[in-house]
Amino acid sequence: MERQGVDVPHVKCKDQEPQPLGESKEHPRWEENCEEEAGGGPASASCQLTVLEGKSGLYFSSLDSSIDILQKRAQELIENINKSRQKDHALMTNFRNSLKTKVSDLTEKLEERIYQIYNDHNKIIQEKLQEFTQKMAKISHLETELKQVCHSVETVYKDLCLQPEQSLRLRWGPDHSRGKSPPRPGNSQPPDVFVSSVAETTSQATASEVQTNRDGEC
């Protein structure tokens, strides 16, 4: 395989600096011999070929050293890039983990707060429902008592309506039952007025009793 010409990049080589081709100390004798044998024909051509081979060897050796240096620098750059990527990846991983931890903690605190609010509201609702149940029970009890009072008032009213008829029958005898109306005294109170006054008194007593029960509840 023949080596093709390669453009040499302008790189400063610290390890090895190529010597100028004109200052080589290995081939001055070859050059002198070539100058002496310049008129010799084939001998001079072989001498020039030898000089060219020596110069090309020096050139390619310096080129190989430059390529090696470039490869080393490229490898160092790649390693530095990989290290930077690893550091960035570790940093992002730590940031993600810390963010997850903070978000989970915040979520737990928020959830606990919401549950606490729910519990407080449930307690308030239970207390209100219990108070409402107690009030409804008291209302039912008062309703029952009111019905009993109304029944008692109705019974008293019926008794008061029947008492004048019985007293008239006892006072006037059987003639009253035959249709004869006895004379009424002037100062006697009509039965209806008497019954109405009794009913008003009873209703006032019932109202005062209900008000007393309400005051006791409050």
Curated annotation (Swiss-Prot):
Keywords noted in UniProt: Cell cycle, Cell division, Chromosome, Coiled coil, Meiosis, Nucleus
Matching InterPro entries: Syce2
Coiled coil ranges: 61-87
Compositional bias segments (type: Basic and acidic residues): 1-32
GO CC terms: central element; chromosome; nucleoplasm
Main location: nucleus
Quaternary structure, from the entry: Homodimer. Found in a complex with SYCP1 and SYCE1. Interacts with SYCP1, SYCE1 and SYCE3. Interacts with TEX12.
UniProt entry tagged with the keyword Transmembrane: no
Name of this chain's protein: Synaptonemal complex central element protein 2
Bias type Polar residues, positions: 198-211
GN (gene name): SYCE2
Function, as annotated: Major component of the transverse central element of synaptonemal complexes (SCS), formed between homologous chromosomes during meiotic prophase. Requires SYCP1 in order to be incorporated into the central element. May have a role in the synaptonemal complex assembly, stabilization and recombination.
Chain residue ranges for the region called Disordered: 1-42, 171-218
Localization annotation: Nucleus; Chromosome
GO biological process: cell division; synaptonemal complex assembly
Family: Belongs to the SYCE family.
